[in-house]
């Protein structure tokens, strides 16, 4: 007997759901004898053979983890005092184990279906309440991508709302974090905004500005009193945004109390690891009067059909998927998983615990400053919370060298100054080691004596007087037992991939394998500061370099930037690259962006942000781009044509035959081709956008490449470009190219990039190709099983779809009154998250099963949809009442089941419509949520404790 003595790679079979026999059965149902034959029928001839991925084998889970561990070991974890918006923190173990590492939390989707999302909606409402309380502003959103992009959103927010309409100048304090100023400049330039950086203490006339950004405390550590300067800006009809440190706000007067219009910042230091720069949750808070102009998602309190308190995403008409180029922002994701960590950090510690952390951090800072002064070191400024700037003169360079020799990183400010930031993890020993480092051979100060004699460095006039976090949720769960059970109760309310498939079209809710997730919490990746010297981040640099090469091979592009920390930011970076390319050729006048009418709303919103004008092109009856209309508009605008943004396979789930011709039309008329990579899961290993006409694409690593959705973030949206666009990829002050940063950190959400590295390394080229093929097979199998019950709206010329299919429910609305919303809510009773509703066509469901779902799960979903069709028939023929039926009343709760039953159908039909549900039943915690009530009676902070008790 021959035994394979190598490490067997079973990962591909673990990742892909259907077994060999199931695969063959599905192929037979479609009329094919092999996966390759089916693929050949789906992929257009014009783009076959464009893949350059290769067919190399992947590594086993154990071998890939070992290889990545060796790479991670090349990162050097020095003691960091760099600060600058990034701080060491302790992630409480119960939050790490029960939230961050829990698939019930990290595999969930954005809570657009509120009935199956009450748990994470409550956690996000806690986050909003936390932010509102600490900032002193009444309304806060459910997180943004990072502090720098939140500042950029605040800038455009001020532009929209300022009454100084003739102004195009925005004041940014020189005391803001440098990475924030860099992103402001990137965002401002295409919009014709001038960013004026200066010292607000030296400002004279402010009438030229529509808005201002101030840092609180300042990046150099000082705590300035902004009350007078805010009044001056307001007198000039300008709005004021304040970038505030949340921990400091537990002790300092909040921005809302000195009349700031907006507060933004990062929640990273509330339990979220440094992660070489991300992902972290930013926040955005503002006045109630401005709520409809606020970017990002907003959780609001509403009621369900029984009048019971229920949560939902509020005011969605602000979002880009609805308002397109008129949207407040192109942001379509948030940082939900990280916001939930931060919110639970506050829940666990409570107001007293947060203040203790802040007071201890500040006390250590004050003692450190007193000791340094005693040693003759010049401390700049009289006030501080946790950060000190030291005037070190000509000794600065040697001081950095000496510090690194001792395993310490100081902040590099300039040739004559260094910075020090303390944090939650700082100790007496740290303070004493800094005295020793900076004091040379002098005798050390007496820590105990200084602790007894040193007072606060916070200005007395700015000490916080208002209470924080008085809601019971922040004062109840302080034992680990209570927090563990609270997190479990919330998770039990939600439907995530750990319960059932999430068949959302255009979202690619595939497996997020445990072996891919494990490296995220390794200290070597989690505890590195993004601005640590390059020699200390060699592990990250090797991993990112290898990942860039992997993504180039998968897409056919020549270069990749990993910086964009969401798909929307990848789109933006891609269009900026196109814009910069045209300008480099003396064609800066090219500003027309063609976008098909079927495109996701992010595309036109992004084009607007990049300073382009959107021209919409038509689609034909089969959902394809109308090539003749495209040609006519490309020719009409040829002198100003900048780009086309096109999704491939199409947003309608079809491989359009004319994609090569479309690319040629744009190139012939002087434009560049932006191919949206949202649907890349149908192409990896089969065809490559960089080889069939694309100049740039963004990829959604949280779709195709296995980063989990986290309940609505994090995401990663790297861009791939052809060589002529490579010089225009995003830069960063920490990189060789210092211009054009689109987010705060050089590698964006760096600490989750190992997930994609692991996925590609384990799958190999052959496995990635097979994943694409199986995604296409699963989608076509569902379409074939359901086509006799629901019309499949779009197919290719061969009657096949790509990796997703669209079911048309509009005829059923006409015959039965049953809407797509009714079907979506009824699926909850069957234990399923609804497919994508009414996108890209109103009244339809778009289904994407991915390659990870087994045939059994596909059949379970199909059986549910078929049973729902039978219920619709019963409404059509009068067997079920048109108003009182299981669809109109869905979803059904356990409380309703045990109460008085007045419906004209049975309890069993309501909650056990299929016998298979008896084995495992998901019970929604609320009935159908009233969206209109929630928007008319907007409440975006924690409701009374009685509401929680009722729940």
UniProtKB/Swiss-Prot annotation:
The modification N6-(pyridoxal phosphate)lysine is found at residue 703. It catalyses: N(6)-[(R)-lipoyl]-L-lysyl-[glycine-cleavage complex H protein] + glycine + H(+) = N(6)-[(R)-S(8)-aminomethyldihydrolipoyl]-L-lysyl-[glycine-cleavage complex H protein] + CO2. GO terms for cellular component: cytosol; glycine cleavage complex. One of its GO terms (biological process) is glycine decarboxylation via glycine cleavage system. Its cofactor is pyridoxal 5'-phosphate. HAMAP family: GcvP (MF_00711). The glycine cleavage system is composed of four proteins: P, T, L and H. This is Glycine dehydrogenase (decarboxylating) 1.
């Amino acid at each position: 007997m021959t035994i394979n003595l190598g490490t067997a790679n079973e990962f591909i079979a673990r990742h892909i759901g259907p077994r060999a026999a199931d695969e063959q059965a599905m192929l037979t149902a479609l009329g094919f004898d092999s996966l390759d034959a089916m693929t050949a029928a789906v992929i257009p001839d014009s783009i076959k053979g464009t893949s350059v991925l290769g067919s190399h084998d992947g590594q086993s889970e154990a071998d890939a983890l070992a290889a990545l561990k060796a790479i991670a070991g090349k990162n050097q974890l020095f003691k960091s005092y760099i600060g600058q918006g990034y701080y060491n923190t302790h992630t409480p173990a119960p939050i790490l184990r029960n939230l961050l590492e829990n698939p019930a939390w990290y595999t969930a989707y954005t809570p657009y279906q509120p009935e199956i999302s009450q748990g994470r909606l409550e956690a996000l409402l806690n986050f909003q309440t936390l932010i509102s309380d600490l900032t002193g502003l009444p309304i806060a959103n459910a997180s943004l991508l990072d502090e720098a992009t939140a500042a950029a959103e605040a800038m455009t927010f001020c532009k929209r709302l300022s009454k100084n309409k003739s102004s195009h100048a925005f004041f940014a304090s020189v005391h803001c974090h440098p990475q924030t100023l860099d992103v402001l400049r990137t965002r401002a330039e295409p919009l014709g905004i001038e960013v004026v950086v200066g010292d607000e203490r030296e400002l004279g006339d402010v009438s030229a500005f529509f808005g201002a950004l101030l840092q609180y405390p300042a990046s150099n550590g000082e705590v300035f009193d902004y009350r007078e300067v805010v009044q001056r800006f307001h007198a000039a009809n300008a709005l004021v945004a304040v970038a505030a440190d949340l921990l400091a706000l537990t002790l300092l007067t909040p921005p809302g109390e000195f009349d700031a219009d907006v507060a933004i910042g990062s929640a990273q230091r509330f339990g979220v690891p440094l992660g070489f720069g991300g992902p972290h949750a930013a926040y955005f808070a503002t006045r109630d009067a401005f709520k409809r102009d606020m970017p990002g998602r907003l959780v609001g309190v509403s009621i369900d059909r029984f009048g019971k308190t229920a949560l939902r995403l509020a005011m969605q008409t602000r979002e880009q998927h609805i308002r397109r180029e008129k949207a407040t922002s192109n942001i379509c994701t948030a940082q939900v998983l990280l916001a939930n960590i931060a919110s639970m950090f506050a829940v666990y510690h409570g107001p007293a615990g947060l203040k203790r952390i802040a007071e201890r951090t500040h006390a250590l800072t004050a003692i450190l400053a007193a000791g340094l002064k005693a040693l003759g070191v010049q401390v700049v400024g009289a006030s501080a919370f946790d950060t000190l700037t030291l005037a070190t003169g000509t000794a600065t360079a040697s001081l950095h060298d000496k510090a690194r020799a001792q395993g310490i990183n100081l902040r590099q400010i300039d040739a004559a100054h260094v910075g020090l930031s303390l944090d939650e993890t700082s100790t007496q020993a740290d303070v004493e080691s800094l005295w020793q480092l900076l004091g040379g051979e002098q005798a050390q100060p007496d820590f105990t004596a200084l602790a007894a004699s040193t007072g606060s460095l916070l200005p007395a006039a700015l000490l916080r007087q208002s209470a924080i976090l008085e809601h019971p949720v922040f004062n109840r769960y302080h034992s680990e037992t209570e927090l563990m059970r609270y997190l479990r109760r919330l998770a039990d309310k939600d439907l995530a991939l750990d319960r059932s498939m999430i068949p959302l079209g255009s979202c690619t809710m595939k497996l997020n394998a445990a072996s891919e997730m494990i490296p995220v919490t390794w200290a070597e990746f989690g505890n590195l500061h993004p601005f640590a010297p390059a020699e200390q981040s060699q592990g990250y640099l090797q991993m990112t370099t290898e990942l860039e090469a992997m993504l180039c091979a998968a897409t056919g592009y020549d270069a990749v930037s990993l910086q964009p920390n969401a798909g929307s930011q990848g789109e933006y970076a891609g269009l900026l690259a196109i814009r910069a390319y045209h300008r480099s050729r003396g064609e800066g006048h090219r500003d027309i962006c063609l976008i098909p009418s079927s495109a996701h709303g992010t595309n036109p919103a992004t084009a607007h942000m990049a300073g382009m004008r959107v021209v919409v092109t038509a689609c034909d009856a089969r959902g394809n781009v109308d090539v003749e209309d495209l040609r006519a508009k490309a020719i009409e605008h040829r002198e100003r044509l900048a780009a086309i943004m096109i999704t491939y396979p199409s947003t309608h789930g079809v491989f359009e035959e004319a994609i090569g011709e479309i690319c040629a039309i744009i190139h012939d008329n002087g434009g560049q081709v932006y191919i949206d990579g949202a649907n890349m899961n149908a192409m990896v290993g089969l065809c490559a956008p960089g080889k069939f006409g694309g100049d740039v694409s963004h990829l959604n690593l949280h779709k195709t490449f296995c980063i989990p959705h986290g309940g609505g973030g994090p995401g990663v949206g790297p861009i791939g470009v052809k060589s002529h666009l490579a010089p225009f990829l995003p830069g960063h002050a920490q990189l060789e190219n210092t211009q054009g940063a689109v987010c705060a950190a050089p590698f964006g959400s760096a600490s989750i990039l190992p997930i994609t590295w692991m996925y590609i390394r384990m799958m190999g080229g052959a496995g990635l190709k097979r994943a694409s093929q199986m995604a296409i097979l699963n989608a076509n199998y569902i379409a074939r099983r359901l086509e006799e019950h629901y019309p499949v709206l779009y197919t290719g010329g061969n009657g096949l779809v790509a990796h997703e299919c669209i079911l048309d429910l509009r005829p059923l609305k006409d015959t039965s009154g049953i809407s797509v919303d009714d079907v979506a809510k009824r699926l909850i009773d069957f234990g399923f998250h609804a497919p994508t509703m009414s996108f890209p066509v109103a009244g339809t469901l778009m289904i994407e099963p991915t390659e990870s779902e087994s045939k059994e799960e596909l059949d379970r979903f199909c059986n549910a949809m078929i049973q729902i069709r039978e219920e619709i028939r019963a409404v059509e023929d009068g067997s079920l009442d048109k108003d009182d039926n299981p669809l109109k009343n869905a979803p059904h709760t356990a409380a309703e089941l045990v109460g008085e039953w007045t419906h004209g159908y049975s309890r069993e039909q309501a909650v056990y419509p299929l016998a298979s549900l008896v084995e495992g039943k998901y019970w929604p915690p609320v009935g159908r949520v009233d969206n209109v009530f929630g928007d008319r009676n907007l409440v975006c902070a924690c409701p009374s404790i009685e509401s929680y008790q009722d729940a």
